[in-house]
Curated annotation (Swiss-Prot):
Protein name per the record: Orotidine 5'-phosphate decarboxylase
Record: residues binding substrate: 22, 44, 71-80, 131, 192, 201, 221-222
Organism: Yersinia pestis
Organism lineage: Bacteria, Pseudomonadati, Pseudomonadota, Gammaproteobacteria, Enterobacterales
GO molecular function: orotidine-5'-phosphate decarboxylase activity
Top-level lineage group: Bacteria
Active site as annotated: 73 (proton donor)
Keywords from the named record: Decarboxylase, Lyase, Pyrimidine biosynthesis
Amino acid sequence: MTSATKTNNSGSISSPIVVALDYANKDAALAFADQVSPQDCRLKVGKEMFTLYGPELIRDLHQRGFDVFLDLKFHDIPNTTARAVAAAAELGVWMVNVHASGGARMMSAAKEALLPYGAQAPLLIAVTVLTSMDGEDLRDIGITISPAEQAERLAKLTWDCGLDGVVCSAHEAVRLKQVCGEDFSLVTPGIRPQGSEAGDQRRIMTPEQAVAVGVDYMVIGRPITQSPDPEKTLREILASLTKVA
């Protein structure tokens, strides 16, 4: 089974940057996409944009040559989650995610749903602990261990289920690579270039710091999308990463 839209998991670009398209409307998102190169970044479409504009937005971005991370964080009963992940594969997205807290049966069902797509399947990533959450937030929902400990617990479960990696804080990267292996992909939001505001992220790092600790893909939003010159800002971040490498 193959997608009619785009070859997605090709690894055709080397940039670790995924730009979050957190715009109020589709025209603004596409205007941004027209300012940057698909060789310099991938693009993330989240709940708000996808709810408003749906698969058409994904197709518009694919037509411009971009790999798309569909960030919908599926969390439901196993059968429903599996079908949702398969639907994402039909769209030809490069990456899709689920919540690790949905449990082993849910994650295993999602992984199995992608088997018919073979090499065309998107990367399947699980969310561990949202980077907006700290220890107090976890205690409020009955979790008494630290965010780092909870992230490690959920990452191990994700690895056991055969998924490709996790969304996590960059602060957990070193430990998760040790526990789950170098081939286990780490996707990190909460990445802010030096001098940027933290916004609603509490556990943040700079791009250079993230690469140094083993992050594979870093999600950056407003520091790039709200820049007066997004292409220049993106290129500056990429240049800073070559120094780390």
